[in-house]
């Protein structure tokens, strides 16, 4: 996992991007070698894989949450599999209420509120746990480039602002893989944070499987206060934009690397910054689960997915899955 901020050259090519291209060529070769040598296994239930082509937040977690609520409403049993980013997890584990973000990852702690979740760093380790849980559907979060298991249904999430960045592979660009192959193979494509009717040119060939989606607040926050925002997620700019669109007065902000594990010194610094700005701290749910915020000193903005074509999603999911 790349633990750094999204650099500017990932969005717009400059000399640094071109200097890093030789390493991107090696990355591409290693990915090809990995895929060619892989012997994918069949998991013991139908698999819905949610992923993206690039590094950084594209709304995958919100898509998984939406799917979990949808399956639950249809009384379909499911298990969510998450990668346990930023955790010290050693082997596949079924998440329970007492687990912390450091043990199983921030996404795992959040998703466990929606159903059974297995955290793992090795997809093959989940099979015994799946055999115990016996789900009808397995929702796999962020294993799109993993060639070691069969996928029955794939959803590719695309951020409407960043799209595919500068078009280069890691580390010269943000891409985990070139998008065309993933988009061709996808059953559905979610264009996230899109409030525009115009479809980006690169996605026009896929309009028949394209869903526009917005990340919208799902809880109430006092709009009369000042707020100092911070986050350690893949796309902090979208979080800050959501806060402003919600009508909050943001007096300052601080960005941490994706899946950042906060230290006590970080927390003390944040409280100091908030005091300087005469503001209350506000952050994301992914960040908030990492704090022992017993006194509710940090406001958390919860978000959910709103989509324009729920019928298309229902039709494709339940027809194929």
Curated annotation (Swiss-Prot):
Binding site for ATP: 54-61
Catalytic class of the enzyme: transferase
MF-aspect GO terms: ATP binding; tetraacyldisaccharide 4'-kinase activity
EC number(s) recorded for this UniProt protein: 2.7.1.130
Keywords: ATP-binding, Kinase, Lipid A biosynthesis, Lipid biosynthesis, Lipid metabolism, Nucleotide-binding, Transferase
Gene Ontology CC annotations of this record: plasma membrane
Pfam family, one: LpxK
The keyword Signal belongs to this UniProt entry's keyword annotation: no
Pathway: Glycolipid biosynthesis; lipid IV(A) biosynthesis; lipid IV(A) from (3R)-3-hydroxytetradecanoyl-[acyl-carrier-protein] and UDP-N-acetyl-alpha-D-glucosamine: step 6/6
Catalytic activity line of the entry: a lipid A disaccharide + ATP = a lipid IVA + ADP + H(+)
Signal sequence region: none
GO biological process: lipid A biosynthetic process; lipopolysaccharide core region biosynthetic process
Stated role: Transfers the gamma-phosphate of ATP to the 4'-position of a tetraacyldisaccharide 1-phosphate intermediate (termed DS-1-P) to form tetraacyldisaccharide 1,4'-bis-phosphate (lipid IVA).
Similarity comment text for this entry: Belongs to the LpxK family.
Protein name: Tetraacyldisaccharide 4'-kinase
Lineage: Bacteria, Pseudomonadati, Pseudomonadota, Alphaproteobacteria, Rickettsiales
Gene name as annotated: lpxK
């Amino acid at each position: 996992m790349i633990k750094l901020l999204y650099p500017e050259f990932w969005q717009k090519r400059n000399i640094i991007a071109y200097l890093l291209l030789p390493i991107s060529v090696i990355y591409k070769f290693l990915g090809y070698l990995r895929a060619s040598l892989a012997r994918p296994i069949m998991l013991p239930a139908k698999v819905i894989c949610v992923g993206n082509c690039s590094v950084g937040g594209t709304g995958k977690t919100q898509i998984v949450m939406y799917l979990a609520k949808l399956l639950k409403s249809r009384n379909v049993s499911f298990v969510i599999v998450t990668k346990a980013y930023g955790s010290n997890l050693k082997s596949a584990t079924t998440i329970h209420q007492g687990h912390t973000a450091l043990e199983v990852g921030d996404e795992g702690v959040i998703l466990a509120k929606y159903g059974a979740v297995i955290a793992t760093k090795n997809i093959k380790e989940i099979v015994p746990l799946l055999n115990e849980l016996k789900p009808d559907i397995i929702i796999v979060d962020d294993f799109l480039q993993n060639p070691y298991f069969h996928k029955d249904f794939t959803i590719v999430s695309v951020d409407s602002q960043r799209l595919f960045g500068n078009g280069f592979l890691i580390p010269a660009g943000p891409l985990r893989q070139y998008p065309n192959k993933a988009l061709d193979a996808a059953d559905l494509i979610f264009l996230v944070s899109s409030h525009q009717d115009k479809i980006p040119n690169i996605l026009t060939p896929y309009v028949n499987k394209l869903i526009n989606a917005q990340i919208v607040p799902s809880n109430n926050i006092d709009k009369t206060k000042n707020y100092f925002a911070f986050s350690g997620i893949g796309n902090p700019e979208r979080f800050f934009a959501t806060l402003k669109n919600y009508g909050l007065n943001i007096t300052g902000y601080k960005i941490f690397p994706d899946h950042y594990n906060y230290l006590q010194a970080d927390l003390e610094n944040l409280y100091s910054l908030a005091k300087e700005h005469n503001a209350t701290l506000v952050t994301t749910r992914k960040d908030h689960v990492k704090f022992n915020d017993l006194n509710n000193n940090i406001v958390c903005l919860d978000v959910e997915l709103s989509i324009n074509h729920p019928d298309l999603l229902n039709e494709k999911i339940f027809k194929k899955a």
